[in-house]
Amino acid sequence: TSQPLLKNIEPFQDKVTIHYGDMTDGSSIHKAIKSCNPDEIYNFAGMSQVWQSYKSPLTTMDINCVGLIRIIESVLSLELDCKIYQATSSECFGKVMETPQTEKTPFYPRSPYGVSKLYGHWITKNYRESYGMYACSGILFNHESERRGAEFVTRKITIAVAKIKHGLQDVLELGNLDAKRDWG
């Protein structure tokens, strides 16, 4: 779990049991999976900001790529009949060759983050085909929530607008105005 984001589940904490695991530590992942003996695993863990992947490409690969292998290998070594879902990203498409993207659109990732998510997509398929596991990936596009971090553009805008309305801020400051995102 991501420690700073635990506040996002405060309303539900009495209804869930949290099993801690560090995606960079195979033994903690193995221990967490063994302790809860899951029927299903949904891997939403990972470095999720493209700009961070340029500053920390090795950490991005360790968490997003090797971390996934740690999950899958733990399931295999524990001989669990467990379904695995890998959250992948539209960043796998990178420089898109067509709009909208489909299952037939070529992948062309343009960042360490995009490459790491494409790795997750393909390694999930590889394990499914090699071991007959129930393992699948979903390519997620932008998704918004009040729980999303303030560093993301939509939250940056909505938070600033609220502050401006209440006289707590005068201007909305944004970064790269040439950046493009598909919110389709």
Placement of each model-derived feature along the sequence:
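N-terminal Rossmann-like NAD(P)+-binding domain of SDR-like oxidoreductases, especially those catalyzing
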Residues: 1-143
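NAD(P)-dependent short-chain dehydrogenase/reductase
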Residues: 7, 97-100, 122-183
